[in-house]
Amino acid sequence: MTRHLIFAAVLLVCLFVCWNAVGAQDARSAFSSEETAQDQHVMEERIFINPAGNREKNACLENCRSSPNCKNYEFCSK
């Protein structure tokens, strides 16, 4: 009888671990697609507001350099 209880407990733990792994993967993919959508929106906004002029690009680079969250200047060069 105790073997059956141990087996059931191990099975429940395995199911719980697998369920959490699938949930975490879904959360990561949802966050990644949300982040990509936000990046795309920022890029579209930059292109729309700053249509390829030198002054606008320089202002974009200065804003990006002064922002602690800016990781690269890629969107400024478009």
Swiss-Prot record:
The keyword Signal applies. One of its GO terms (molecular function) is toxin activity. One of its GO terms (cellular component) is extracellular region. The lineage of its organism: Eukaryota, Metazoa, Ecdysozoa, Arthropoda, Myriapoda. Belongs to the scoloptoxin-04 family. This is U-scoloptoxin(04)-Er1c. Residues 1-24 form the signal peptide. Keywords: Cleavage on pair of basic residues, Disulfide bond, Secreted, Signal, Toxin. The keyword Secreted applies. It is found in: Secreted. It comes from the Eukaryota. Contains 2 disulfide bonds. Residues 25-28 form a propeptide. Expressed by the venom gland. Transmembrane segments: none annotated.
